[in-house]
Amino acid sequence: MATVIPSPLSLGEDFYREAIEHCRSYNARLCAERSLRLPFLDSQTGVAQNNCYIWMEKTHRGPGLAPGQIYTYPARCWRKKRRLNILEDPRLRPCEYKIDCEAPLKKEGGLPEGPVLEALLCAETGEKKVELKEEETIMDCQKQQLLEFPHDLEVEDLEEDIPRRKNRAKGKAYGIGGLRKRQDNASLEDRDKPYVCDICGKRYKNRPGLSYHYTHTHLAEEEGEEHTERHALPFHRKNNHKQFYKELAWVPEAQRKHTAKKAPDGTVIPNGYCDFCLGGSKKTGCPEDLISCADCGRSGHPSCLQFTVNMTAAVRTYRWQCIECKSCSLCGTSENDGASWAGLTPQDQLLFCDDCDRGYHMYCLSPPMAEPPEGSWSCHLCLRHLKEKASAYITLT
């Protein structure tokens, strides 16, 4: 019995247009990927395909050369690989050149003979002995310097410095080499981590890391000591610690929203530097406009925040919030946010839009979502504004 195939128009015009749009976007992305990755592996045949160079432009056309030929296109430059040609015919062997080494030696005086040669050899051995003695004296001086400062040495270097019966000089060289390696590593660490804690001496690469260290180590220790022991630390150390916080202008995470710097009109004054790269803009190397949080004033470059082009343009149209101040755009609360997902159900988590970075509770959406979607997700505002350019349409379903 014959089956009836329904017409596409009977399914609805909106459904048909949506299917065509998905097909168009898929073909566009497929062609873009094929032009970028060469050679690419054909998923149907399993063959690594290369660019065939059959697509030419009008500017490449030339006059026809053969009768009946309308156009000609320039050929690709082809170069044959060089290979080693084995000459089997004895008559085709390369010419043999005999270099007369004795002639220039005779012209320049040649090698000395008799007692003159012996004197030169004795002088060379004497120079070598002098150099060895100088090296030994230098090693002894370095050894004395190391013994004057024994606290700078590690246990392994002290063990290696113990003279052995077979290789006495080798053991000395190991200890000095280890010290040089440690000095080089220390200089590299000083260069890579310029921010130093004035209490424990720990180093960090950036200022936010140093601020985190102060908060979660020394500040917590001081608060506990104030409750348990009133005379635990001297006053000058605590005052220096608090003075460092004043110079740093750092605010704890729990008090950032309430103690952010505000203008006379009540608006939050944004920071003039990026909190991630501290103004270096290391990812792009180009100047970028900062994006500031409307609640705490923290700023960041779009490249440091890993924002797309759509997201960078969208965050300037509303009061953008950083990840620490993020709240639901529908209910306005920040409970059960994504920063503390441990022990929460998927419905209690904040879902972020991939086009505008707005946050939504999954139970605030209409209809509510039971679990986060796979791939990119766009909110209803971005779907209405961007339409087919939204991330949800580009993602394959």
UniProtKB/Swiss-Prot annotation:
<feature type="binding site">
    <location>
        <position position="382"/>
    </location>
    <ligand>
        <name>Zn(2+) 4</name>
    </ligand>
</feature>
<feature type="binding site">
    <location>
        <position position="356"/>
    </location>
    <ligand>
        <name>Zn(2+) 4</name>
    </ligand>
</feature>
<dbReference type="Pfam" id="PF00628">
    <property type="entry name" value="PHD"/>
</dbReference>
<feature type="binding site">
    <location>
        <position position="296"/>
    </location>
    <ligand>
        <name>Zn(2+) 2</name>
    </ligand>
</feature>
<keyword id="KW-0805">Transcription regulation</keyword>
<protein>
    <recommendedName>
        <fullName>Zinc finger protein neuro-d4</fullName>
    </recommendedName>
</protein>
<dbReference type="Pfam" id="PF14051">
    <property type="entry name" value="DPF1-3_N"/>
</dbReference>
<dbReference type="GO" id="GO:0008270">
    <property type="term" value="F:zinc ion binding"/>
</dbReference>
<feature type="binding site">
    <location>
        <position position="293"/>
    </location>
    <ligand>
        <name>Zn(2+) 2</name>
    </ligand>
</feature>
<keyword id="KW-0862">Zinc</keyword>
<feature type="binding site">
    <location>
        <position position="364"/>
    </location>
    <ligand>
        <name>Zn(2+) 3</name>
    </ligand>
</feature>
<feature type="binding site">
    <location>
        <position position="301"/>
    </location>
    <ligand>
        <name>Zn(2+) 1</name>
    </ligand>
</feature>
<keyword id="KW-0963">Cytoplasm</keyword>
<feature type="binding site">
    <location>
        <position position="379"/>
    </location>
    <ligand>
        <name>Zn(2+) 4</name>
    </ligand>
</feature>
<feature type="binding site">
    <location>
        <position position="304"/>
    </location>
    <ligand>
        <name>Zn(2+) 1</name>
    </ligand>
</feature>
<keyword id="KW-1017">Isopeptide bond</keyword>
<feature type="binding site">
    <location>
        <position position="328"/>
    </location>
    <ligand>
        <name>Zn(2+) 3</name>
    </ligand>
</feature>
<dbReference type="InterPro" id="IPR001965">
    <property type="entry name" value="Znf_PHD"/>
</dbReference>
<keyword id="KW-0677">Repeat</keyword>
<feature type="zinc finger region" description="PHD-type 1">
    <location>
        <begin position="271"/>
        <end position="328"/>
    </location>
</feature>
<comment type="subunit">
    <text>Component of neuron-specific chromatin remodeling complex (nBAF complex) composed of at least, ARID1A/BAF250A or ARID1B/BAF250B, SMARCD1/BAF60A, SMARCD3/BAF60C, SMARCA2/BRM/BAF190B, SMARCA4/BRG1/BAF190A, SMARCB1/BAF47, SMARCC1/BAF155, SMARCE1/BAF57, SMARCC2/BAF170, DPF1/BAF45B, DPF3/BAF45C, ACTL6B/BAF53B and actin.</text>
</comment>
<feature type="binding site">
    <location>
        <position position="353"/>
    </location>
    <ligand>
        <name>Zn(2+) 4</name>
    </ligand>
</feature>
<dbReference type="InterPro" id="IPR013083">
    <property type="entry name" value="Znf_RING/FYVE/PHD"/>
</dbReference>
<dbReference type="InterPro" id="IPR013087">
    <property type="entry name" value="Znf_C2H2_type"/>
</dbReference>
<feature type="binding site">
    <location>
        <position position="331"/>
    </location>
    <ligand>
        <name>Zn(2+) 3</name>
    </ligand>
</feature>
<dbReference type="GO" id="GO:1990837">
    <property type="term" value="F:sequence-specific double-stranded DNA binding"/>
</dbReference>
<feature type="binding site">
    <location>
        <position position="277"/>
    </location>
    <ligand>
        <name>Zn(2+) 1</name>
    </ligand>
</feature>
<keyword id="KW-0863">Zinc-finger</keyword>
<feature type="binding site">
    <location>
        <position position="361"/>
    </location>
    <ligand>
        <name>Zn(2+) 3</name>
    </ligand>
</feature>
<dbReference type="InterPro" id="IPR036236">
    <property type="entry name" value="Znf_C2H2_sf"/>
</dbReference>
<comment type="function">
    <text>May have an important role in developing neurons by participating in regulation of cell survival, possibly as a neurospecific transcription factor. Belongs to the neuron-specific chromatin remodeling complex (nBAF complex). During neural development a switch from a stem/progenitor to a postmitotic chromatin remodeling mechanism occurs as neurons exit the cell cycle and become committed to their adult state. The transition from proliferating neural stem/progenitor cells to postmitotic neurons requires a switch in subunit composition of the npBAF and nBAF complexes.</text>
</comment>
<feature type="cross-link" description="Glycyl lysine isopeptide (Lys-Gly) (interchain with G-Cter in SUMO2)">
    <location>
        <position position="133"/>
    </location>
</feature>
<feature type="binding site">
    <location>
        <position position="322"/>
    </location>
    <ligand>
        <name>Zn(2+) 2</name>
    </ligand>
</feature>
<keyword id="KW-0524">Neurogenesis</keyword>
<dbReference type="InterPro" id="IPR011011">
    <property type="entry name" value="Znf_FYVE_PHD"/>
</dbReference>
<feature type="zinc finger region" description="C2H2-type">
    <location>
        <begin position="195"/>
        <end position="218"/>
    </location>
</feature>
<dbReference type="InterPro" id="IPR019787">
    <property type="entry name" value="Znf_PHD-finger"/>
</dbReference>
<feature type="cross-link" description="Glycyl lysine isopeptide (Lys-Gly) (interchain with G-Cter in SUMO2)">
    <location>
        <position position="106"/>
    </location>
</feature>
<keyword id="KW-0539">Nucleus</keyword>
<feature type="binding site">
    <location>
        <position position="274"/>
    </location>
    <ligand>
        <name>Zn(2+) 1</name>
    </ligand>
</feature>
<keyword id="KW-0804">Transcription</keyword>
<feature type="cross-link" description="Glycyl lysine isopeptide (Lys-Gly) (interchain with G-Cter in SUMO2)">
    <location>
        <position position="129"/>
    </location>
</feature>
